[in-house]
Amino acid sequence: MAMSNLPRDLLEEVLSRVPVKSIAAVRSTCKNWNSLTYGQSFTKKLYGKTMATKEKEFLVVMTMDLEVYLMRVNLHGIHKDDNNVKSSIMQKAKLIRLNDDRVRVDDICKVFHCDGLLLCITIGIRLVVCNPYCGQTRCIKTRRDYHITDNYALGHEKMKNSPLRNYKILVFHDKSFLQNSWFEIYNFNSDSWKVLYFTCDWKLPFSQLVVSLKGNTYWFAREMYIHGPRIDLPDFLICFDFTTERFGPRLHLPFHSRCVDTVTLASVREEQLAVLFQDSKTLILEVWITTKIEPNAVSWSSKVFLEVNMSPLTGFQFNRSFGSFFIVEEKNVVVVPIKGGHFKRNLAYIIGKDEYFKEVDLGVPSSYIYFSPHVCSYVPSLVQIKKDAQVMLQHHNVSAEKHHEFCASL
């Protein structure tokens, strides 16, 4: 049987064994193979072949002191041997800028992830999209001057009868006391912006409380209160659907938080959404995971994933405005990055049941008090973007020229 006649699943299995550096040649062979290699199913197979040999390892993206790092996480055996904790979260690569002053990937204050692409927001409010796995970047020309408090999101439109995806960027300013507002959408395919107006009865407390899932973006939101500040307002999730280019209805949460409490979002396996809630009075931390999440509907697990009293462990509340976390389901733990050591160190707390609590130094000294470390999930992708310049991953203790070898080992 000819390769072109193989079932799609079998063809993906065969082509996923091709080295990463040869994928370009595969794509140029025929239209069918080119289309297939852009699909998430193929990417997962390609990535899974490498990671299957690495004992429960996975990657996350961390922003620390205005720089972006890929961190390799391996919590295998942490409960058995606490000596392994120091090496459980290790820096593997750093995003660096090469030979092009038009595209700066340093001084990055915010990063948003979708399908292996990173939307980086710089201190100077420049928008740069990069695929660190492929070493590509795209500098996005904006319509106007944006502000650090604007809300940003990266997602994709679902294309009918095609595995290809049309990626988009959403930017909007949450005017706390105005119901009539607008947002801007950048379309990668047309390289253009458009402005849409909408009416809302909610506000976003903090622009970092956001996660991309299945191409759509979810925010933690509160009901708008026009007549002044209140400490106790209805809270919920709001989704922006990049296919319809509309915000969805309010999605209920499994708890109620006050404005002084901590609420943070994270993705789980790129399929479900997790929410961390910490009461500011009791310091009790709860983590909940969805069983279904769509732009117009959500359901939650009947049992809390993790519940821990942080009062005897840390004695303080996690960051409300720039907090982040990720979970490791098989270990029943959450990992929360923080500023520690009188704001001189970037740390991560590993928190589990029965008061399991460990501290890991992330290996990047802290120089900026006001920029807490921020983590988001990361799954390598072969999504191609029209590039302006080449941005590489600087492997920890390895020269930048080793980029291709490092990509193959991700």
From Swiss-Prot:
Domain F-box, residue spans: 1-46
Parts of the chain that traverse the membrane: none
Alphabetical list of NCBIfam families matching this protein: F_box_assoc_1 (TIGR01640)
PANTHER family linked to this entry: BNACNNG10540D PROTEIN, F-BOX PROTEIN CPR30-LIKE
Protein name: F-box protein At5g36730
Naturally occurring in which organism (per UniProt): Arabidopsis thaliana
